[in-house]
Curated annotation (Swiss-Prot):
<dbReference type="GO" id="GO:0000287">
    <property type="term" value="F:magnesium ion binding"/>
</dbReference>
<dbReference type="Pfam" id="PF10509">
    <property type="entry name" value="GalKase_gal_bdg"/>
</dbReference>
<comment type="function">
    <text>Catalyzes the transfer of the gamma-phosphate of ATP to D-galactose to form alpha-D-galactose-1-phosphate (Gal-1-P).</text>
</comment>
<dbReference type="InterPro" id="IPR019741">
    <property type="entry name" value="Galactokinase_CS"/>
</dbReference>
<dbReference type="GO" id="GO:0005829">
    <property type="term" value="C:cytosol"/>
</dbReference>
<dbReference type="InterPro" id="IPR006204">
    <property type="entry name" value="GHMP_kinase_N_dom"/>
</dbReference>
<dbReference type="InterPro" id="IPR006203">
    <property type="entry name" value="GHMP_knse_ATP-bd_CS"/>
</dbReference>
<comment type="pathway">
    <text>Carbohydrate metabolism; galactose metabolism.</text>
</comment>
<feature type="binding site">
    <location>
        <position position="162"/>
    </location>
    <ligand>
        <name>Mg(2+)</name>
    </ligand>
</feature>
<keyword id="KW-0963">Cytoplasm</keyword>
<feature type="binding site">
    <location>
        <begin position="124"/>
        <end position="130"/>
    </location>
    <ligand>
        <name>ATP</name>
    </ligand>
</feature>
<keyword id="KW-0299">Galactose metabolism</keyword>
<dbReference type="InterPro" id="IPR006206">
    <property type="entry name" value="Mevalonate/galactokinase"/>
</dbReference>
<dbReference type="InterPro" id="IPR014721">
    <property type="entry name" value="Ribsml_uS5_D2-typ_fold_subgr"/>
</dbReference>
<feature type="binding site">
    <location>
        <begin position="34"/>
        <end position="37"/>
    </location>
    <ligand>
        <name>substrate</name>
    </ligand>
</feature>
<dbReference type="GO" id="GO:0005524">
    <property type="term" value="F:ATP binding"/>
</dbReference>
<feature type="active site" description="Proton acceptor">
    <location>
        <position position="174"/>
    </location>
</feature>
Length: 382
């Protein structure tokens, strides 16, 4: 049964009438451009065919009822006329409440709604299950009540809800790609202007995501340290962000910087340049160049930004040994575990899967999870 059928059937059973709309919003993977978002730089993600799906209908009162199919059909109810505060027990409900509250704060007027939510974006893998939920809820209200919001505004509202209501610091990339993704394309995003450019993906290329299943422990504290180091670097150059520093300016004075800060800055500057070049390489179908850029990105994350772990490096090496120069592979996400992403000709996927199955667990003692994805459409009716 599809997520659409599942949520529609649960909706009718729970609420006693049929849903009027079914909305989906996808998860995402970032192909290249790591830790560049909060430096006002460039990222190149694509939406994937794992998504959050919501069957819904408007109500003629001010009540919101939400059922979470993936959490034993837990039900949350709240009123649009009372202050919306955090739910004490259901963490999932706070993503919904936060999005609704922030839409209200933006002076959108809408009535009550019934929703049933289900999703298959793997949680905790760094594939943006939370952003896809936020964008799905925003799209539900926009569609049901014809709110004058575009995808970028729905994305910004979701980011605001996550930062301020849920209390988790995140950039804008995850929500933006979920809202604006385009089938068979990646999206080059300028994280300063929020400008986007759709970049066509070469035919016959699979987007493979492999979760190392290495439990991330350092990610929060180390992420904040990296942000501070980047801000220190920007201050040294008297610029608002590292986006505004050229590699030539950096090379001329690198020796004056604290050696660790210098390494962090070098990663951001070179990664921004790689990301812009990667968009051109993809568009021209130059998988060889894309592979080189992804390899450089991984080496930079490993040696200059120091956010990889041995398990991730091992996974990357296993995949690279199979694909050679026919594709690319690198760590994706915040670091210290999580996933790698590979762009691979479809005919090589079985060989990659076999090599990883035979070698990764033997070398690390951890079993990986393997996903083959297609670049997918952003949020909308399904």
């Amino acid at each position: 049964m599809s997520l659409k059928e599942k949520t529609q059937s649960l909706f009718a059973n729970a609420f006693g009438y049929p849903a009027t709309h079914t909305i989906q919003a996808p998860g995402r993977v970032n192909l290249i451009g790591e830790h560049t978002d909060y430096n006002d730089g460039f990222v190149l993600p694509c939406a994937i065919d794992y998504q959050t799906v919501i069957s819904c209908a408007p109500r003629d009162d001010r009540k919101v009822r939400v059922m979470a199919a993936d959490y034993e059909n837990q039900l949350d109810e709240f009123s649009l006329d009372a202050p919306i505060i955090a739910h004490e027990n259901y963490q999932w409900a706070n993503y919904v409440r936060g999005v609704v509250k922030h839409l209200q704060l933006r002076n959108n007027s809408f009535g009550g709604v019934d929703m049933v939510i289900s999703g298959n974006v793997p949680q905790g893998a760094g594939l943006s299950s939370s952003a896809s939920l936020e964008v799905a809820v925003g799209t539900v209200l926009q569609q049901l009540y014809h709110l004058p919001l575009d995808g970028a505004q729905i994305a910004l509202n979701g980011q605001e809800a996550e930062n301020q209501f849920v209390g988790c610091n995140c950039g804008i990339m995850d929500q933006l790609i979920s809202a604006l993704g385009k089938k068979d394309h990646a999206l080059l995003i300028d994280c300063r202007s929020l400008g986007t450019k759709a970049v066509s993906m070469p035919k016959g290329v699979a987007v493979v995501i492999i979760n190392s299943n290495f439990k991330r422990t350092l990610v929060g504290s180390e992420y904040n340290t990296r942000r501070e180091q980047c801000e220190t670097g920007a201050r040294f150059f008297q610029q608002p962000a590292l986006r505004d520093v050229t590699i030539e300016e950096f090379n001329a004075v690198a020796h004056e910087l604290d050696p660790i800060v210098a390494k962090r800055v070098r990663h951001i500057l070179t990664e921004n340049a790689r990301t812009v070049e990667a968009a051109s390489a993809l568009e021209q179908g130059d998988l060889k160049r894309m592979g080189e850029l992804m390899a450089e990105s991984h080496a930079s994350m490993r040696d200059d930004f120091e956010i990889t772990v041995p398990q991730i490096d091992t996974l990357v090496e296993i995949v690279k040994a199979v694909i050679g120069d026919k594709g690319g592979v690198r760590m994706t996400g915040g670091g210290f575990g999580g996933c790698i992403v590979a762009l691979i000709p479809e005919e090589l996927v079985p060989a990659v899967q076999q090599a990883v199955a035979e070698q990764y667990e033997a070398k690390t003692g951890i079993k990986e999870t393997f996903y083959v994805c297609k670049p997918s459409q952003g949020a909308g009716q399904c």
